[in-house]
Amino acid sequence: MNRFATLLLALLVTSPLYAQALQVAKPDTIPDRPEKLVFSELDFTVPDGDTYRHQLPNGVVVYVAEDHTLPLVSLNVMLKVGSYLESAEQVGLAGLTGSLIRSGGTESLAPRDFDEQVEFLASSLSSSGEGTSASAGARSITPAVEESLALFFDMLRHPRFDLERLEVEKSNAIEAMRQRNDDADAILGREWSWLLYGHDYYASRRMTKNNLDGINREDLRAFHAKYWRPENMIVSVSGDVETDAILASLERGFADWPGSGASNRWPPPGPTHVVVPGVYHVEKDIPQGKVLIGHLVPQWTDWSNPDRAALQVMDHILGGSGFTSRIMKRVRSDEGLAYSAGSDFSFDSFQPGTFTVSFQSKNETVALAAKISLEEVRRTQEELVGDEELEVAKGSLIQSFPRRFDSAGQIASTFAYDTFIGRSHDYWQRWREQVGDVTADDVRRVAQRYLKPDEVVLLLVGKWDEIAKGDPEGRASMNNFFGGKVIHLPLRDPLTLEPLAGK
């Protein structure tokens, strides 16, 4: 057990809160029937995001949420940096840069020495790079905050990008590539992103060995120097801090690190690929076919649009609420075709989002499960949902809403993300009212407007001979979709992503 875990355990064991949690309820206070349980009325006030917002002299926005329950502090830096800034020849550069900032040491400390100092402080530091964002984080016990921040800013500002650690990262990446075709879900996700966004879009590009071989230490240094800059950063801090004190510490950390004034093409560009609806298949000898059905939905930038609340209620009813959703009830509970089935209406601020139905089923029942799922999509467009179904969905969403602000960390990170995507903090003040105002007519209206069951991409990974025939009772086959036409996609070389011969 490392020092951080040991100290945390000691704090928990001696905490009055922990002791209270261990107290056993008296038997006479426990009702003998579930329906006799009495709950206090939910009284929750949404925090005011502006009260947590601060700005450093160099322009960096910081959100601070104090919580003195335990002597722990968390800090996260979110950056408007990601793989959308890579060239097509250097796919993976943003991710490698993000990873090596933490693992590759600093100019003054070799990786092992840096790791030892972090461990000695019982701290945890991290960094990463993704599609439209990068991040760096620190966790520390309160007595070690200043020393941890010193290491954190050394890492953030002066990464070494150690050559040996870079080779380790590359070796790990190649090993991960070699396993790409072992997992049907990985194949499904890869082909799905290409079908919806195209091969050349940053969000769907996949790193190859050639890409990896073409990235060197100087590329990482250049990417960091150009984009990991204060003007691209938003900071959130939570835990056992005094706001004025932590702001002063951050100001010192950012001292002498001015913004470059260079643009990083924010927001990221949208895709130009034209989606072609139809049935697509990748052959793989597995007992259960993996299935995704769906289409793109509009990019979401108008956060005041009440359609968002109606769509969340609609998706909750259709397939987003687990065992209570329509798709799950029919596909699993009624027909026993899958362990899990559902839908997801995904909102994205930087590119078109997706509406997706997903499940896995025996190869011979894939067609029937797909047919039933699309029937439920159409039913949501054609019929008004029932009053009870509507109220349960709205109640579930509203009752779970306070969990978004359960902790100081969630408060700070939620409001920081608002700033990241350009969403007003007032959005949260209006959200519950908007959900509560959703009617059955609203659910049907947004289903008709945003769902396109006749224009879906239906992607399958599995044994085509079994999938095509359909279920033994003849209730559905792949002839039910797009006139029986199918495009067979090749299995790809895991290192080059070129089609494998004969596959």
Predicted regions and their residues:
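Acidic/histidine-enriched alpha-helical segments
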Residues: 111-119, 160-178, 242, 261-276, ...
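M16/insulysin-pitrilysin zinc metalloprotease superfamily fold
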Residues: 103-109, 139-170, 321-322, 346-404, ...
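Mature N-terminal segment immediately following signal peptide/propeptide cleavage
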Residues: 38-76
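A structural supersecondary motif
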Residues: 83, 292-296, 319-361, 414
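M16/MPP (pitrilysin/insulinase) zinc-metallopeptidase core fold and M16-derived inactive scaffolds
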Residues: 74-139, 182, 202-206, 321-337, ...
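An aromatic/glycine/proline-enriched structural segment found at the starts
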Residues: 22-32, 37, 199, 234-301, ...
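Scaffold signal of the M16-like zinc-metallopeptidase fold and its non-catalytic homologs
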Residues: 21-35, 148, 180-230, 250-253, ...
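Bacterial N-terminal signal peptides
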Residues: 6-16
